[in-house]
Amino acid sequence: MIPGEFYISHGNIELNVGRQQVLVTIINTGDRPIQIGSHFHFYEVNSALKFNRVITRGFRLNIPSGTAIRFEPGQFRTVELVKYAGACKIYGFCKAIMGKLD
């Protein structure tokens, strides 16, 4: 085995099966692009992104780990979010939660 090498199964790999998901339409009202990573708590993203923030509490982008989505100034975009799993403790980000979600 080579350090960092992966052995991936053949076929499709399904992500986040059975987790609650929500579609959200967003507009970037700022004058600069905003990029959001795969595991950032969407409720706490840059305030220049306008959307129904309340429904995004406890959700993140439903995209592969380590990737991101970029929102250009003035751009409308609909994205799919997925509910966090596990202990659902949120720390850091913009410090809006700092503990258990429920």
Swiss-Prot record:
It is an enzyme of class 3 (hydrolase). Gene3D superfamilies: Urease, beta subunit (2.10.150.10). Pfam families: Urease_beta (PF00699). Pathway: Nitrogen metabolism; urea degradation; CO(2) and NH(3) from urea (urease route): step 1/1. Disulfide bonds: none annotated. One of its GO terms (cellular component) is urease complex. InterPro entries: Urease_beta-like, Urease_betasu_sf, Urease_subunit. GO terms for biological process: urea catabolic process. It comes from the Bacteria. It is found in: Cytoplasm. The keyword Cytoplasm applies. It catalyses: urea + 2 H2O + H(+) = hydrogencarbonate + 2 NH4(+). Heterotrimer of UreA (gamma), UreB (beta) and UreC (alpha) subunits. Three heterotrimers associate to form the active enzyme. HAMAP family: Urease_beta. Belongs to the urease beta subunit family. PANTHER family: UREASE. This is Urease subunit beta. It comes from Blochmanniella pennsylvanica (strain BPEN).
